[in-house]
Amino acid sequence: MFISGLENGHTTEAPFTFAIKNEDINPVDYEEISNIFRPGHADYSKYVKYNGNAFKTGGGIFSGRMTAPIVVAGTVVRDILLKMGIMLESKIIFGESGTGAKIKVSVHGVKAGVGEPFFDSFESEIAHAMFSIPAVKGVNFGEIENLYNKKIEDIYEEYEIKDGEPKLKHNYWGGVDGGITNGEEI
């Protein structure tokens, strides 16, 4: 439910506020395991950080339920980006074991020159946001999974002029050089 910041399908000057009611709350389900540190969960790390004073009922900031508000915010941002001529495509690639997946995201329409070198690089800002999503364990840009083991001469990148603009022949590095976008697909 949208509380403020949205009116007649448009954002307003008010802070963007929404609420998602969790109707699947059942703390009893967690009673038997409330004193067990579950692998793959934040049980132990939050126990240490907060001196044992943290949710033991599956809720709280470490819950997978925290993905829901990120999805809502992402939907609003996607619509804003579309109006700016920036389009996102995504594809889920499931692992054979069924225990995980990759999400491939391609971004088109980002102009060259976005980002900063070093700590505020385009990649570091995106990675920072991605790692805020529960269960994300890695972020790659470009074709790094296919290229890390190749010789540099096999992946040498060159610019060519297309339609009067410099364009990369291959775009191996995913549209970002030196932390700054180069106008290619990300």
Residue positions per predicted region:
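Generic N-terminal targeting/processing segments that precede catalytic cores or assembly contacts
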Residues: M1-I186
